[in-house]
Amino acid sequence: MLKPPGLHFISLLVFSTIWIQGFAVVDLHKHYQNNETFQGEKIKCIDELGCFGTGGVFFHPLFRPIDVLPDDREVINVQFNLYTRDRPKDERVLKSSDKNSVLKSEFSINRPTKFIVHGYIDNDLFGPWMKSLKDELLLRGDFNVIIVDWSGGNKLPYYQATANTRVVGAEIALLISRLEEWIGLNPEDCHIVGHSLGSQISGYAGERINRLGRITAVDPAEPYFQNMPVEVRIDPSDALFVDVIHTDAKTIFLMGLGMSQEVGHVDFFPNDGTNQPGCKKDQILSFITDGLLEGIRRFVGCNHQRAVDFFHHSINSHRCVPVGYVCQDWETFLQGRCADCGVDGSRCAIMGLRAEKFKPHKDDGKSVKMYLKTSGSSPFCLFHYQVIVKLFKPSKSRDERGHLYLSLKGDEGEVDFTLSNDLEEFYHGAQYTYLVTTDKHIEG
């Protein structure tokens, strides 16, 4: 058995541009202009990006009832802003139509490349989180960090923004293909981090790129994507490794904004993916501590945004590592019955930037669901302890009823736990298992 990081044991004892019908091959881009109808479906073709249609897998009467064409490319106006350690504050704008914009920039194929993609009604109002994430990444390593700004296409109505995500994904794929053609970029060195609709954009980009390295879906948007075919939503085939963080997984009918569906190679559900600790407090305090705009963001979607917080703090966290564990369900996890990484380490993984260490254990045909607990304030990480209590059964013994307490001492401190909040029956010869967590680092 491997000892998992961060947990301790205590024992008391791409879309096609060609339509094939019969034996006839029709090039949609040549034969159909924008917004024309083809067999009852509307189609829009965009130079270099291909054709986008309504209907088919993109329509569902319940899950995707309004299906429209994307806006024009000029309206969505995708911008690629490059940051490096050489220029951490001043962006270089990269353009897929301008080779010199790349050649004259600090972009290097000798560095891994990180894309950051925002979601709905984001960036122009709520951009600071992306630049903060960029700063953390550059502190961590020597990366090319590209912030993708598609704020021209992410406004109301929501269904129009969802349609525009397909174009944004195609734009990212086009830039990567240009970088591959112009300077020899290896797509396997590219990692797209997308939040909300940005997660779905990452999937659209990945399906067009041969061997995209990694996608991190940060609470991928539920409305218009949950329960839809893989052509419509993110799925494990979109990159060589897809990891997902779920923090707002209630149904949209209960005001949840993120997917509950498992859509990656590994899907993390911190705090069961719902009701994140600290959010009720954050919704009010954020107006004071973070300003009006970020306060609005937290008030409307604290659970949804919490996935960004978790990823952000995972980048340079060393003292405490957020580890998720495979478990039957959340209740079983809370009972302390899932603390085994397995002999090969395949039953646990680090949530966040270092999740790629799970890649050797991935199964392209199966999503692995993992649970962990977090605190309600930064850096959010908790140390998890599995406590196993086994009672002997001497010849003269009787069962007892009461509370069980634990005092845990380490080189750097001591923490007291109440293992049984309610009166509990204790039977001689029985074994009891608990999960306790703390944000205190008590071991050297």
Where are these regions (language model features)?
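Alpha/beta-hydrolase fold nucleophile elbow
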Residues: G184-S196, I215
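Short, solvent-exposed loop/turn segments at the edges of secondary structure
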Residues: S237-L240, Q261-V263
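Active-site nucleophile loop of the alpha/beta-hydrolase fold
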Residues: R214-F225, V244-K250, G273
